[in-house]
Amino acid sequence: AGGREKAEAEAKRQAEIEERARARAKRDAREIWTAAKPGPDPILVDYLAARGLRFDPWPKSIRFDPAAPYKVKRAAHRGGNWETLHAGPAMVAAVQGPDGKFSGVHRTWIDPARPGQKMRLAHPDSGDDLKSKLTRGSIKGGAIRLTDPPGASVMVMGEGIETTATAWISG
């Protein structure tokens, strides 16, 4: 019985750790969203225009952070801590759960020196390329709703914001 009780206690402890991590991720996502500026920003408008996208009206689900921090976990010999590698412009999109409520964020770091391009970053320890798009919060089963017109009879879905927006804007 002692082994089973220990295993159950460990499973409960792990579940509590995971629940705290999920709650922290949701809080982080809300803070990121709240800190981002609503409405179009010239850097974001230029990025999207270089990709052939012009929103009218501007989606409420898209915001801009001029100095979004990009954090990486450093190698153990460097302390193993999270460190800000880059702070720069990012498109911030709200992710909504199936219930329509905010559940997370999707960020795309933009390279203003290269129109229409995402920021290129490499991990300082390994040199590996890093993703220019990151999410935070509860993303599974969620969607970034660019528009929600009343009485719509067609739904456009896609893998990425820019890809989906291209299909939506083209009609």
Predicted features along the sequence, with ranges:
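Phosphate-handling DNA/RNA-contact segment within nucleic-acid enzymes
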Residues: 70-171
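TOPRIM metal-binding catalytic domain and adjacent DNA-binding surface shared by DnaG-type primases
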Residues: 2-91, 96-99, 149
